[in-house]
């Protein structure tokens, strides 16, 4: 009995570790199965990822092939592209220079109008005549435009025509005196004034009963005119600014002539009457009106036509337009003459009043018809634009510079 009991216990003892091993083996199997399952899953994932990569590569290759089929193959190198770019730039420059800088002469229009310069010249106070506008309205617009220009000039020069005090013009007197002095020197140089007046008298048509006229006395004076009391006024009727200047000249300007009156009745040279005359201007004073005008002015043309002279003077209204200086004297001027006359050879008549009054009347009429208001004189002004042919340089400056250069060279 004891042996059997011992065997049963021993058998139980032997069986029990086998069960534990079995459980351990089962766990190991489960773990192996789990590992195998994980390895299979990882392998499947790797296969799937590899398959996806292959599909992406195939798609990229297909896209690249499609792009290559759509776009032509570009086999240009960098050097070839650079050369092509330089050639294209040079070609563009040549085309620009040819067609934009050097234009063809045949394409340049020969006729130019004021409209071509409308985009270049800044025009202010522009007047345009519209269709259907009467001449009176145009004249009113021009008058308003002129008044606006004058008011702008006075405003920008800070000059009040009503309250500004008169100016003395001392500086202007000096310039006029220098000019007159130079003219006198040129007139007296080589007896130029004598020859000029003598040629004028010889070429003048004189009546048959007057013999040759000879010059006996010429005096161009030694004094100068004095300008003073200058004031700027606005001419309401003319629509322009005028300078009113008082002029005073006290000098002696004398011209003496001698001739003979020929009595040709009843036969030629029946009698000869010598005549000697000397006319002197001793005093002149008056108010001088000076203004700048345009020779294309309509009022100026009408006045010139109405006051056209018969002495062969040139018609300035036929010339082109431009700036001119207009001057005239007021009717209340003062002009004094001294006329000396001597008639006869043996029994002489000296200073005949009738002859003096006749000569003085003729001279006053000549002056009134030309320079007294409403008549005026128009002097066209030359172009003041700087030109090379009018450029001068003092010679003394060059000599002084050369001397200074020579002195410096000697010092060196």
Curated annotation (Swiss-Prot):
Location, primary (coarse class): endoplasmic reticulum
User: Compositional bias (Polar residues) spans?
Assistant: 397-412
Report the membrane topology from the UniProt record. Single-pass type I membrane protein
Topology: which residues are Lumenal? Answer: 1-81
| Compartment(s) of residence | Endoplasmic reticulum membrane
Which stretches are Cytoplasmic in the membrane topology? 103-412
- Annotated membrane-spanning segments are 82-102
Q: Enumerate the UniProt keywords alphabetically.
A: Endoplasmic reticulum, Lipid transport, Lipid-binding, Membrane, Transmembrane, Transmembrane helix, Transport
Region Disordered: which residues? 389-412
Quaternary structure note: Homodimer. Component of the ER-mitochondria encounter structure (ERMES) or MDM complex, composed of MMM1, MDM10, MDM12 and MDM34. A MMM1 homodimer associates with one molecule of MDM12 on each side in a pairwise head-to-tail manner, and the SMP-LTD domains of MMM1 and MDM12 generate a continuous hydrophobic tunnel for phospholipid trafficking.
Q: What does this protein do?
A: Component of the ERMES/MDM complex, which serves as a molecular tether to connect the endoplasmic reticulum (ER) and mitochondria. Components of this complex are involved in the control of mitochondrial shape and protein biogenesis, and function in nonvesicular lipid trafficking between the ER and mitochondria. The MDM12-MMM1 subcomplex functions in the major beta-barrel assembly pathway that is responsible for biogenesis of all outer membrane beta-barrel proteins, and acts in a late step after the SAM complex.
Could you tell me which HAMAP family the record lists for this protein? Mmm1
Protein name as annotated: Maintenance of mitochondrial morphology protein 1
Q: Which gene encodes it?
A: MMM1
């Amino acid at each position: 009995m004891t042996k059997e009991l011992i065997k049963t216990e021993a058998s139980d003892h032997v069986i029990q570790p086998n069960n534990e091993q079995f459980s351990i083996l089962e766990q190991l199997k489960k773990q192996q199965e789990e590992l195998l399952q994980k390895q299979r899953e990882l392998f499947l994932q790797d296969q799937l990822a590899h398959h996806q990569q292959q599909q992406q590569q195939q798609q990229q290759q297909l896209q690249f092939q499609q792009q290559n089929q759509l776009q032509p193959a570009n086999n240009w190198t960098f050097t070839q592209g650079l050369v092509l770019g330089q050639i294209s730039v040079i070609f563009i420059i040549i085309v620009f220079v040819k067609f934009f800088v050097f234009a063809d002469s045949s394409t340049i229009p020969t006729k130019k109008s004021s409209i071509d310069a409308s985009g270049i010249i800044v025009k202010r106070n522009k007047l345009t005549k519209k269709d259907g506008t009467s001449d009176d309205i145009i004249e009113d617009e021009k008058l308003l435009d002129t008044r606006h220009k004058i008011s702008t000039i006075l405003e920008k020069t800070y000059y009040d025509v009503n309250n500004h005090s008169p100016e003395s013009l001392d500086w202007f007197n000096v310039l006029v005196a220098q000019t007159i002095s130079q003219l006198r020197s040129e007139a007296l140089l080589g007896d130029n004034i004598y020859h000029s007046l003598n040629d004028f008298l010889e070429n003048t048509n004189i009546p048959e009963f007057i013999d040759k006229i000879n010059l006996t006395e010429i005096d161009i004076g030694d004094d100068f005119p004095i300008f003073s009391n200058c004031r700027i006024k606005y001419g309401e009727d003319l629509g322009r600014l005028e300078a009113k200047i008082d002029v005073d000249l006290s000098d002696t300007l004398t011209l003496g002539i001698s001739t003979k009156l020929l009595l040709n009745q009843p036969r030629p040279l029946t009698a000869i009457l010598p005549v000697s005359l000397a006319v002197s201007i001793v005093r002149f004073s008056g108010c001088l009106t000076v203004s700048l005008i345009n020779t294309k002015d309509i009022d100026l043309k009408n006045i010139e036509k109405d006051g056209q002279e018969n002495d062969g003077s040139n018609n300035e209204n036929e010339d082109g337009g431009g700036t001119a200086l207009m001057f005239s004297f007021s009717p209340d001027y003062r002009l004094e003459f001294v006329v000396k006359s001597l008639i006869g050879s043996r029994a002489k008549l000296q200073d005949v009043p009738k002859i003096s009054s006749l000569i003085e009347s003729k001279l006053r009429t000549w002056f009134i018809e030309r320079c007294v208001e409403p008549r005026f004189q128009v002097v066209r002004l030359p172009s003041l634009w700087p030109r090379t042919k009018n450029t001068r340089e003092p010679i003394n400056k060059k000599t002084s510079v050369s001397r200074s250069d020579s002195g410096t060279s000697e010092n060196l």
